[in-house]
Amino acid sequence: MNLHRISSEPKCKCLNHEIQNARLHYGRFAVYPLFPGQAITIGTAIRRALLGEVHSTCITSAYVVGASHEYSTLKGIRESIHDILLNLKDIVFKSDTLERQEGILLFNGPGIVTAQHIKLPPVVQVVDNTQYIARLEMPTSIEIHITLENTKTCTSLNTMPTTKGRFILDAALKPVRNMNYSIHSLGEGDMRQEMLVLEVWTNGSLTPQEVISQASQNLNDLLKPLLKVERYFQAKQNIHKKRMFTPTQSENLNMDQIEMIGGNKLIDQPLLPADSHLNSSLSLNIDNLVHLEGISIDDLQISVRASNCLKKVGIYTIRQLLSYTQQDLFQIKNLGKKSVEQIVIAIRKSYGHILG
């Protein structure tokens, strides 16, 4: 392979940018020239980052004055409380702040209530003022107090008081509506190169250029630790036969991992039900592990709810989390059995450690 056949550094060029409506932006980008095989590597990584790791601001809770429960109705209003909440959940906002913000909706009927009637702080803007909320069919009023948060720092699921008329909304609104990529050949034979074409659709809270930039930065941050690889482990040659895992217990550990664990003590202690294959705990010397103090729990593939529960009790890094046992996790408020199992499995898969 001729490593010098690419004469210039790869670059990204915007081929097209269309605003089809307030909540639908389209962008088309080309990344070139690339070595064969690089396009699919970048395309796969950027697609996952775009669809799962780009954040935006949305409504996370709403207090509806006069509402008794989610399926109740208010006199003179066509929609039920449930329908109103669904409409609020779909409203698209634009904001640069990560701080929690408050807004209020006051409207006197009759008339149609839309997103333009929400009073917001200057740091938050509504993308589409025409988004429908409700219809008041008689001279009545509606009052809704809303809380807005960035999905990156959302904590409302755990910290909002459970008062009558307050409803928690799932912060699931993503700025990237869809993403496709295609790979095209440039040149022939030994001079063959590749071009990666990215197509991105957003909801208007961020432009296609902005989400590409944010996703790329997230990938860059993820790979930074690999630029500073150090030798944190000293391999041990012998492992006592009595302390070896059985095939069932060690099916997810390869020999290199076992050798790195070396002579560390293996503790036979039940963690999860027998069918989970997590019936052995690995006691590791945390000081000999990689520098986990600077690695956020956000790097774990766990739900936002589980992550927020951990942060609420002061667990922000992997190293802090590894000091907890499974029983300790069960004591954390709002952290259920399913979330604990999710955390235990994520720690085992990512760091080869089983919580006691």
From Swiss-Prot:
GO biological process: DNA-templated transcription
EC number: 2.7.7.6
Secretion signal span: none
Segments of this protein annotated with the region Alpha N-terminal domain (alpha-NTD): 1-230
Catalytic activity: RNA(n) + a ribonucleoside 5'-triphosphate = RNA(n+1) + diphosphate
Keyword Ion transport assigned: no
The keyword Cell division is annotated on this UniProt entry: no
InterPro entries the record matches: DNA-dir_RNA_pol_insert (IPR011262), DNA-dir_RNA_pol_RpoA/D/Rpb3 (IPR011263), DNA-dir_RpoA (IPR011773), RBP11-like (IPR036603), RNAP_asu_C (IPR011260), RNApol_insert_sf (IPR036643)
GO cellular component: chloroplast; DNA-directed RNA polymerase complex; mitochondrion
Group of enzyme by EC: transferase
Pfam families assigned: RNA_pol_A_bac, RNA_pol_A_CTD, RNA_pol_L
Location of region: Alpha C-terminal domain (alpha-CTD): 267-356
Record's keyword terms, sorted: Chloroplast, DNA-directed RNA polymerase, Nucleotidyltransferase, Plastid, Transcription, Transferase
Lineage top rank: taxon: Eukaryota
Subcellular locations according to the entry: Plastid, Chloroplast
GO molecular function: DNA binding; DNA-directed RNA polymerase activity; protein dimerization activity
Disulphide bridges: none
Family designation: Belongs to the RNA polymerase alpha chain family.
Assembly: In plastids the minimal PEP RNA polymerase catalytic core is composed of four subunits: alpha, beta, beta', and beta''. When a (nuclear-encoded) sigma factor is associated with the core the holoenzyme is formed, which can initiate transcription.
UniProt free text on domains: The N-terminal domain is essential for RNAP assembly and basal transcription, whereas the C-terminal domain is involved in interaction with transcriptional regulators and with upstream promoter elements.
Function statement: DNA-dependent RNA polymerase catalyzes the transcription of DNA into RNA using the four ribonucleoside triphosphates as substrates.
HAMAP family found in the cross-reference section: RNApol_bact_RpoA
Record-given protein name: DNA-directed RNA polymerase subunit alpha
Organism, scientific name: Zygnema circumcarinatum
Organism classification: Eukaryota, Viridiplantae, Streptophyta, Zygnematophyceae, Zygnematophycidae
